[in-house]
Amino acid sequence: MTKSLKYLFILLSICLFTPFSLYAVDDKIDLSKGQRMYVPAYSHIYSGSKERPFLLTVTLSIRNIDPTHLIKITLFDYYETQGKLLKKYIDKPVTLNPLESLRYVIPEKDKSGGSGANFIVEWHSDKPVNQPIIESIMIGTKSSQGISFTSRGREIIASE
């Protein structure tokens, strides 16, 4: 019994005297007033030794995760593998209210982007806000096989 009490005392001591910051996953929230983001999009991937294309539907998701402030999407362009602009999705800013999401879909049959397609998305806010989640979701099925994966956007230019 005394041995168990010793172990319990040691365990409690470790828990009580360990700095709280070691328990926190992320004690710093990155706020920003805007960014230009690069988001990979795979309209197809290759499979097998003959590198057969496996066509995918691409969904671009933009999520304003700030609970109190809106953001404006000011640029949303789709590029193909060689970097040629395929489509400008907006011609004027689109406002996303707090916690609002927006999505655009590239159909599976649209192969124009190729395996190295990408989106460039730019957003702005009047105040520092939680950075939105901007990601692409790829999904496809062939026979009885299905595949799905995501790719997060990366900042390429920060706004001042």
Question: What residues fall within each predicted segment?
Answer:
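Sec/Tat signal peptide C-region and signal peptidase I cleavage site
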Residues: 20-26
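Intrinsically disordered, low-complexity Pro/Gly/Ser/Thr-rich segments with frequent PxxP/GP/PP motifs
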Residues: 80-118
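Terminal connector regions
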Residues: 26, 110-160
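Asparagine-centered strand-capping/turn motif at beta-strand->loop junctions
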Residues: 62-69
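Short, hydrophobic/aromatic beta-strand segments
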Residues: 69-76, 87-89, 131-135
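Short, solvent-exposed loop/turn segments enriched in Ser/Thr/Gly
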Residues: 52-59, 117
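Bacterial N-terminal signal peptides
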Residues: 9-19
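Bacterial N-terminal signal peptides that target proteins for export
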Residues: 1-9
